[in-house]
Swiss-Prot record:
Classification via InterPro entries: FluC
Activity control summary: Na(+) is not transported, but it plays an essential structural role and its presence is essential for fluoride channel function.
Protein residues bound to Na(+): 75, 78
UniProt family annotation: Belongs to the fluoride channel Fluc/FEX (TC 1.A.43) family.
Biological role stated in the UniProt entry: Fluoride-specific ion channel. Important for reducing fluoride concentration in the cell, thus reducing its toxicity.
Organism, scientific name: Desulfovibrio desulfuricans (strain ATCC 27774 / DSM 6949 / MB)
Coiled-coil annotated spans: none
Membrane topology: Multi-pass membrane protein
Lineage: Bacteria, Pseudomonadati, Thermodesulfobacteriota, Desulfovibrionia, Desulfovibrionales
Full protein name: Fluoride-specific ion channel FluC
Amino acid sequence: MLKTLALISIGASCGAILRWFLGLMLNAIFLPIPLGTLAANLLGGYLIGVAVSMFNALSAVGPEFRLLIITGFLGGLTTFSTFTAEIGVLLQGQRIMTAVAAIVLHVCGSLIMMLLGMGTFALLRTCFR
């Protein structure tokens, strides 16, 4: 149990640091919608698609590695709380259309990126057989 907690914690720390770094690098580029949070969620969506597909296809991958990557790293990278807070700020500022655009970009974008990640894994798996 302690090993599992350590793996999740290490993964989550790494994911959160990457999310913070993306915010530092990207949030000032386009002020209406913080691009760092969007990039974190889209990248996380893509990587979750790859990871889920890979773990389903490769039964030799142990549950600890799944917890490290999916629960830990990708859980720390993606962020519903920051997304929600940013939408709240937009709504408080009466920027309804910007809030709606951000919601669509985050939710639909993450789902599309997840499907692209799954497709990428399927394509790579076919190419390297």
